[in-house]
Regions:
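Short catalytic micro-motifs in class I SAM-dependent methyltransferases
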Residues: 130-134
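Class I SAM-dependent methyltransferase SAM/SAH-binding core
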Residues: 57-59, 63-113
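Short conserved loop adjoining the S-adenosyl-L-methionine
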Residues: 112-120
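Core SAM-dependent methyltransferase catalytic element
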Residues: 208-238
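Conserved class I S-adenosyl-L-methionine
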Residues: 2-50
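A short glycine-rich, Lys/Arg-flanked "PGG" loop and its adjoining helix->strand segment in the class I
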Residues: 142-154
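C-terminal alpha-helical "lid/dimerization" subdomain adjacent to the S-adenosyl-L-methionine
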Residues: 161-210, 215-217
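A conserved beta-strand element that flanks and buttresses the S-adenosyl-L-methionine
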Residues: 127
Length: 238
């Protein structure tokens, strides 16, 4: 979760409140089948074989749900889990505590460049899942993409799975209707969020501006998309 407190309609989200965070995580269970499918897609795009050793950072990692899946598929990977919420960092640490020395969970506020002080680049891979839409300012998001570019090593890949603005406002009700069935109550919760920072095409353009090449929208389904790009040469080993 990128910010400690965000406004969503009349609801005030407080990511420093453990009760709120645990309730939010509980509500995500309604989306378990979709989350598992999305995580599997992200993992399938990692350009590494199952036996490769590499370092990656999960940006706005939450409690580490994605990382459980990724580390199971890539057992030699080492992970940095970064989140702005101290509660999420605590829960992520507990998830892997004592059982997985490959993982470190750290706190960092993505609303400024201060998060860079909490991490130890370079990384071979950077990922984010359903989080960066909280950065509603396009300027800050473009800055963040440039910062992510800087923490990647040569040949590194960044992927962002997130909600993005519809190409046309007229399409939003249709996307909302189509996604409601798969996302259950969560779709109702965010139905008023019409102005995410950028369409998928705009995100791809911002990644290119940050230095990523090649870049692409790797996958899209209604308002969800995976956008990303490489830093330098593309090398696929798996």
């Amino acid at each position: 979760m990128t910010s400690l407190r965000t406004e969503r309609g009349q609801e005030r989200e407080d990511w420093t409140d453990e009760a709120f965070v645990r309730d939010w995580l509980r509500r995500q269970e309604e989306r378990a089948p979709e989350r598992e499918r999305q995580f599997a897609m992200l993992c399938s795009l990692v350009p590494r074989s199952a036996n490769d050793s590499f370092r990656y950072i999960d940006i706005a990692s939450g409690d580490g749900s994605l990382d459980t899946v990724l580390l199971d598929r890539y057992p030699k990977a080492e992970a940095t889990l970064l989140d702005g919420s101290p509660v999420m960092v605590k829960l992520a640490g507990e998830r892997f505590s004592g059982t997985d020395k490959r993982v470190v969970a750290v706190q960092g506020d993505l609303e400024t460049s201060a998060w860079l002080d909490a991490v130890k680049p370079p990384y071979d891979l950077a990922m984010s899942s359903i989080a960066l839409h909280n950065l509603e300012d396009p300027t800050r998001l473009r800055e963040l993409y440039a910062e992510i570019f800087d923490v990647l090593g040569e040949g590194g890949l960044f992927m962002n799975l997130d909600y993005m603005r519809a190409p046309s406002r007229a399409l939003w009700p249709l996307y909302q209707k189509a996604s409601r069935r798969s996302e259950g109550g969560f779709a109702m919760e965010i139905r008023s969020i019409r102005d995410y920072a950028g369409t998928a095409d705009e995100h791809v353009g911002w990644l290119r501006e940050a230095g990523f090449a090649p870049v692409d929208c790797f996958w899209r389904e209604f308002r969800l998309a995976i956008v990303g790009g490489f830093k330098g040469s593309v090398k696929v080993t798996g």
